[in-house]
Every structure is written in structure tokens, then in C-alpha cells.
Amino acid sequence: ITPKKKIENAIQVVGTNGKYSLCTTLREIFETAGYKVNMNISPSLKKFNERYYILGKHISDENLYNLLLEVEKINSGQNITFHEFICACFFLEASRNRSDVNILESGLFFRLDASNVLEKNIASVVMPIGIDHKDFLKKGTIDEIVYEKCSHLLNNSKIIISEQNDEVLKKIKNNINDNSSTKIFFNENFIYKKNKYDFVYKDDFGEITLPLPNLSGDFQISNVSTAICTIRNLK
């Protein structure tokens, strides 16, 4: 069995903005509830080890060194990109350290991303999409970007779409129209309202009043709300 086939209960996160905040919020909620979590982020912020969060901690320098050497040996000099290499490292390490949930942040896009090798997941989350990495595309239009990020999300799962501008939302809906997954949209299936000292999250399961996130920017409320929605829809 290849390492990727051992990655169970995966949540795949795509988009332009807020992916890291979403991933870390999901991780904190799961761990607070007692679940074991593996997480792969891209890029790292301060140290390369941050990319691989395995069962409660970032990979150590020694384990990272040995992992990189092992995957390099397995690759046997074949052509491979940096992102493909580091994704392969995560899949191998995560397959050896089984968790209750695996959180995967996609790279530049998703359709051809090295993280897009799973055959099933428990959710795909689409964070706010904007113009990014135009140099890697033929035209660099928002249509092309939305296609790359959303057209190949896995079927038979859940797709949670975070707060988007109206133009992007229409394009996302067009791209996932034929996807068999259950679709959950901000402003249709879940909402939030900011108050002075707290905010109210509401969806089909009810509403929750929570303190404001200890992070600057109202967009963080949106990120937290998307994380809550994702977890509440994993039933």
C-alpha cells in the first residue's frame, strides 16, 4: 500500500487567502476535542519544519533530515519538483504516524498540485480566491485561477465554500456544479455576525456565541466561522 492510500480522513484546503489560519484553527479545535492531527502547510513561515505537523508537534530536525534523505533515495534521481518532493515526504511521514484527521494545505493551485493525489477525503474547503501566481498560468485571469483551484475537488465528499466576492462565487459554483459532493456555502448555509465583544455563528445546526478571535482583522472571524462550519458538517 502506497503512503497516500494510508492518509485517511483528510481535509484538503484550497484558495488564495486564509488557508494557514483555517488549517491551524481546524487543528486547534480537533486537538482540544482530543483528536490526533497531522497537518501539512505550504509554505512555512519561519522554519521548514513547520510544514510537517505530526501528532501534536512539528517534525524534529533529526527526523526531518532522515526523512528527506529517505525520500531522495527512493526517488533514485528521477525528475521531481521541490513541491512534489516535500509533499511525498509528508505523505510518507503521515502514513507512519496514523492520526484521526489529516489537514492538507494545497500549493499554488490544486488541479495539478502534488497534494492532489488522494482518492477520497472527508472535506474540501475553498478559502477566499483572488488573483495570485499569474505567471504560472496562460492568461492569469480569475476564471483560470478559479478553474485551477476548484475544478478537480474530490467527489462524494463535502465542499465548504468560505466568504467570497460575488463574481468569484459565481465562478466557483460553475466549476463545482457537476461535482457530486455536498456543497455548503457561506451566506446560504452558514453565516456570522460581529458584535462589539463577540460574534455569533449560525448554521442549520443552530447558533453559537463566541469571543472575537485574538487576531487582528475581521477576516479572521470569517476564517474561524469556516473552520466551525467544516467541523460541524463532518457528521
Residue ranges and their predicted role:
Residues 26, 30, 87-94, 224-234:
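Buried hydrophobic packing segments
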Residues 97-106, 112, 121-210, 224-235:
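Acidic, Mg2+-coordinating active-site environments of NTP-dependent enzymes
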Residues 75-79, 212-218:
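A short glycine/serine-rich beta->alpha loop
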Residues 11-13:
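Hydrophobic anchor at the beta1->P-loop junction of P-loop NTPases
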